[in-house]
Amino acid sequence: MNIARAQCAASSLTPETRGDAFRKKGQVEQAIEAYLEGVAAPPSAALCLKLARCYEQMANYAEACRWALSIVDAGDDFTSWQAGWALFQRNAQKARRPAVRSVKVALLGSYTTTQLCPMLCLAAGKLGIHIDLYESRYGQYQQDILDHKSGLYAFNPNIVVLAVHEGDLHLPEYSQRPEEDVRKEVSRWTGLWQMVTEHSRARIVQHNFALPCEIPTGHLTTRLSGSRYMMTQAVNTRLGEAAANAVSLVDCERLSALIGK
């Protein structure tokens, strides 16, 4: 009876659970077989990571890299992306994995960009692109750009990413002269673009500004051209016009509407 119960319990386990049990016992090959049984299209990020770790244990570095990169198509769980990038870095050189191309990226932000770095590198790795990354210090994007002797220009990047957010706009909560304030703010950003192009050959990629959800005047805000909310919309529009083909804009306002703010 106990044997029958045990067999019944074993048969009810999912492939991933069986794989976990095998891996815990050190039976890595059996764990891989079980995990592969549970692979869906696309597999979960957790399962991709487990397979990558198993292949790393078996010194199959190429497969470890392949499954680490598969995390990109498996969801947006940050911890999985972070672990996947660390695992990929450990195994890529051992696997002698060739990169289709290599690019030097300078990441400048008005917020902490530490979490963005591994996600950016892993996503690029999935496309066969190796990123040599320069990360500016927290909130130092303007200082880096204005100082022609800064680490930014010494790095000589191919791409400069301006990862900035709405809180860094130099706009009041309400303005009696909204057109002038918008013009000044747009001029500040386009001036930074000009400095980058004067001191480097880098392509600029800038995040535009996601509008805040909670605003003091609520629905009335759209009737107030001098409100920060409406001025931010105007800045986004004007930056889009000014960018033309010279600067690539990431529409964070649209993305936040899709994903959440």
Regions picked out by a protein language model, each given a short descriptive name:
Residues 107-108, 207:
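Short hydrophobic segments within beta-strands
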Residues 85-96:
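A short, compositionally biased domain-edge/stem linker segment
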Residues 115-117:
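Short helix/loop capping segments that flank catalytic or ligand/cofactor-binding pockets
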Residues 43-48, 73-85:
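Boundary/linker segments of alpha-helical solenoid repeat arrays
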Residues 6, 10-11, 17-20, 37-44, ...:
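Alpha-helical cap/lid subdomain in secreted, periplasmic
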